[in-house]
Amino acid sequence: MKPTELQIGDWIGRVSDDKCIIEDYRQVDWIRTGEIGMRYQKVWSIGCIEPIPLTYEILKKNGWKDAEFWCEYQEGNNSIQACLPDMRGRINGIDIEHFKCEYVHQYQHLLRLCGLNELADNFKV
């Protein structure tokens, strides 16, 4: 994973020396060459982090519900339908076809692109 793939507020996981993912997830607070600053945590080197796989369980934790062919999120004017893993669906009427979205931080980027910054920044893992 490279620092250029990340944005402030993205969720990532810390890995141990043997590269096994630890259930220690943090949001990126700042980024500089070779280091990532975490919220409420010390600095992590870029070699110590891994992306968090996006799963239906994580979507459901964030208010998504099962629909016939996908998960669906409805709140106010926001309407999202998502079909993993190739991310077919719609976000507020915008067709999303085969957007590469295997990881939580990629989904956060997609939400931000569609103007859903608050939802992206408050995403839970």
Describe the function of each predicted region.
Residues 115-125:
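Charged phosphate-binding loop/patch that engages nucleotide di/tri-phosphates or the phosphate backbone
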Residues 40-65, 100-114:
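Intrinsically disordered, low-complexity, charged/polar segments
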Residues 63-85:
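Amphipathic, interaction-prone secondary-structure segments
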Residues 80-102:
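Intrinsically disordered, low-complexity regulatory segments enriched in Ser/Thr/Pro
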Residues 18-48:
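Basic/aromatic-rich interaction segments and small domains that mediate binding to polyanionic partners
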